[in-house]
């Protein structure tokens, strides 16, 4: 951000659940911002701040005039904090407005939840990218699903503004319009990609539109000012849930625009590269499971959802040419397998010998600080700690210590696993999402010049682990893991770049992207399993789409017809969004190549002449006169 007279230039950023500001010229923290340079993002959410472990956003937010508008990544467990959208003054750090994504009494949408849900329901957050129409002063929010993702007996109703595209007055935070793309989400179908602002020719008129691509493969396009759909959307019936207390919404909105992913898994669509042993395993597995769009998860059988939690369009996966009405979507055909399991009392998952072992270990090493009933004292509460922390992190804390807690290097794996299960955890739960609830060690000129003092970490408090007293709630809780073990379950192409002409509502072209070494051995027609996760694109006004993909791939496509104009393979895996900038009239493309290649990618870092990890900058060669 910079002031209109260009004298005040600031870098606004989030760190350790805080919002801070740095002078962009000197690199010094601006200590007049917030409370001595620090805004605590755990404050102002109508929850005990000490119970909030994670609130900072995965994305930097968006600037509108003198406001920075922030989303958040509060987690996806039971009792995660709400993902309310907040705007702060970039000069003072003052909170200017809050939009309650889980409505409170008297607010629009409150009646789409149980009356007390705002006290315990969480998420409905923007963890991805917002978009702002600066001329109209409208910010567009792609909101995520409510917690818990896969079982919603404690949130019966449509659950506004979950899974909704919401248009707010960027100055005041007041709602202008909204559209909910999934009612009462039970599948983790967040809106995870940036809404694209473009102008389309529709019914003989030029209309300023906003378009959003979803994780479950649909494209929705609206009038940017009114929220009116430009293409028909039909509410269609879908199966009911067979889970106790659950009421799946009877209909879901289906866009009339062509889908960009498949929506079911069948025996005929299994990966043809599977060895026979795996193919036979899946043929048998599909006989006892169910698959289909909007099929509610169950504890009675496995549901194979396509797309799954990481399918379709995710963050960084959309771009557009606003003047031509063209939108581009990077998508991956990635299924999830779900089976709900009742959360049992900790000791119910353990044998008698394991319970004795855990109690003996706890009494000897943990009781003094964490209390006889695990409710905390000198150290935080451990009640249901296994539901709030992944096993690998838990194991690391036990072995290596944290803060004032020493490490216990003598503890064997069986005892650590039993203790974790005793605390309500499941060691098999995969950690697909990096946690952000630990204090980062900060070095460099900011600290050297007198950085803002880091406040006490939220981990010192006890996270919310049960419903508030007096609130009606289901007797049982159910959970499942993300079911992401088979990224190449379906036949290829596994990842693609899809071009939509939103003037006509058609797909203009589709090209596979990414490189796979496991199944197709580098075949360019298949793409790569999970090929666009944490990848992105840049769309130029001159008709080129630059896109990154799994396997260290960087492409330049003709934006009009999808022809590959140029491609290269980087020495390291790409991460995040590529960017472009212009200096002295020349354009430069910057790509982050700092990642490690997955097991199903070729290790280009080991090849002769490989470049070190870093940012790669490309430009067209100078034309000799």
Segments from the language model and where they lie:
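Beta-sheet-rich non-transmembrane sensory/scaffold domains
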Residues: 1-352, 417, 421-625
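Extracytoplasmic electron-transfer domains, predominantly the class I c-type cytochrome c fold
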Residues: 56, 138, 351-356, 360-433, ...
